[in-house]
Amino acid sequence: FSNNLPPRYRDAINALAPKAIDINALLVDVLHISPKAQAKGQTKVTYHESCHLQKSLGVSRQPRDLIRMNPEYNLVEMAEANRCCGCGGSFTLTHYDLSLKMGQRKRDNVIASGAEVVATGCPACMMQLSDMLARNNDPVQVKHTIEIYAESLPR
């Protein structure tokens, strides 16, 4: 990414990049928050791996660990959890029809999992998943992984 920038920006980006970390990775890898036991709550939740978290940042296990922290949820894996939902960056704007097909496939996998909630760590994916589920009148909720984790904290 930074190779496409003018040198004056490239140096700043390369200096900042190692200091940036996803909140899921921060909580699990740096602050060492982890589930004490596998949660087996009543509400089934599945996890969608966003492209930027899994491919660019290597974040995959950490969001699942945070979901498992909430005893109200039971994490169930969907097929192709790591497959793009069709909303990466400006892709949905430049390839709208293909984006819809990809989103529909992701929606089908969410429904097939039997989950009542689909979690992801990406706001763009949240919008795409919400749109695909709403188009089909599906009752599945879309939540950010940190929202599910926050629900488990004492109030």
Residues covered by each model-derived region:
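Iron-sulfur cluster-binding electron-transfer modules in prokaryotic oxidoreductases
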Residues: 1-155
